[in-house]
Each structure stands twice: as C-alpha cells, then as structure tokens.
Regions:
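Short beta-strand segments
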Residues: 22-24, 72, 158-160
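Phosphate-binding glycine-rich loop
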Residues: 48-91, 105-107, 115, 139-149
Length: 181
C-alpha cells in the first residue's frame, strides 16, 4: 500500500531512535525551559525582548545585513518574502510534499500554487518531475516563465528540505535558469 511505503521512507530519514523525536511536538531542555521562564517573567513572550534583540544583533553580524526583520513564524516569513517579490496573480511552484503553511503563504500573498511531484526516495521536490512539468506547460517570453495554458507568469519555485534532507539544488538551479524562474 502506498501509505505504508511513504511511512517506511519517512522513517528512513529519521534518526535511529525516531520514536524519541517528535516532528510536530516541541522538545525543551533545561536551558530552554529556564529561558522561557525568563521571558514569561519579563512579560516579553512574543516579538520583542532581550532575546529578540540579541538574536537580531547576532544575525546582523553573521550576515553583514544592516536590517533584519524577525517574524513570529515561518509562515509569516514566507508570506512577507512573497509579498516583497510581488507574486500577485502569478503562479508559484511548490513540492507536493510540504506543510500547509507553504501553500497558505502563497494564497495569502495572492499567488496561485501549483504542486510538483516529489521524489519517492527523498520526498523532496523531484528535479525530473519539475523539468517534465515545465517542458509541458511553460514558455519563456521576455525573460519570464509563462504558463501557456493559463497565460499567467510562473514567478517562483519554492523548495522545501523535507525532514531536513537537502534538496538537489544544483539540478534544480539548472532548470530554473533555463525557464527564468
């Protein structure tokens, strides 16, 4: 059965004692709990406080960026990134194996999500399926990727490193360059 096959593949990606690690449940060590208590006691438990300021400062130093904007969630970060590049009424390619937040961010930023099949072995976006999809529906005009069926611009390809397994970015980069994504 396909579901058993998928579960088996997911378990192969996880640490040996996978039952000790929860994907959707937070785990906190003693230091984390101590820091959380400090935040609660300070009344800064959201998007402001000494930890936010410290982290922002460290990120500026590491990246060399003058401005850093932290968000309260990955969903918010995806939404802001998509708004910044103006995907309004454009199509966005996503892997079929992803968290709902990826597609939600696209829809909330007024984009149109299109799902590309994932690899059976890595569960990541499959470069072969991406190439097949684009060769069937895309044309490049004026350095823009256009869906010849809808007439809309395909502006973005979002990749997700499923369970921390890195996507084959080199193969995907060649494809995105070919199609001006």
């Amino acid at each position: 059965m396909i579901i058993d096959h998928i579960i088996k593949k997911i378990k192969l990606c996880l640490p040996i004692k996978y039952s000790e690690f929860q994907i959707h449940e937070p785990t906190f060590d003693k230091r984390d709990i101590s820091n959380i208590k400090k935040c609660v006691e300070s009344t800064f438990v959201s998007t402001k406080g000494c930890y936010i300021d410290s982290f922002t400062s460290k990120l500026k130093n590491i990246t060399g960026c003058k401005k850093i904007l932290l968000t309260s969630s990955g969903t918010s970060a995806l939404f802001l990134a998509l708004k910044a590049i103006d995907i309004d009424s454009c199509e966005v390619l996503l892997p079929s194996m992803t968290f709902v937040a990826t597609a939600n961010a696209v829809v909330n930023a007024n984009g149109i999500p299109n799902f590309i099949d994932s690899s059976e072995t890595s569960l990541n976006l499959c470069p072969i399926k991406l190439e097949e999809y684009l060769s069937d529906i895309a044309i490049v005009k004026n350095k823009k990727c256009i869906n010849k069926n809808t007439g809309r611009v395909i502006k973005v390809l979002m990749v997700v490193h499923t369970y921390g397994d890195p996507v084959d970015l080199l193969s995907i980069k060649k494809i995105t360059e070919k199609y001006c994504l």
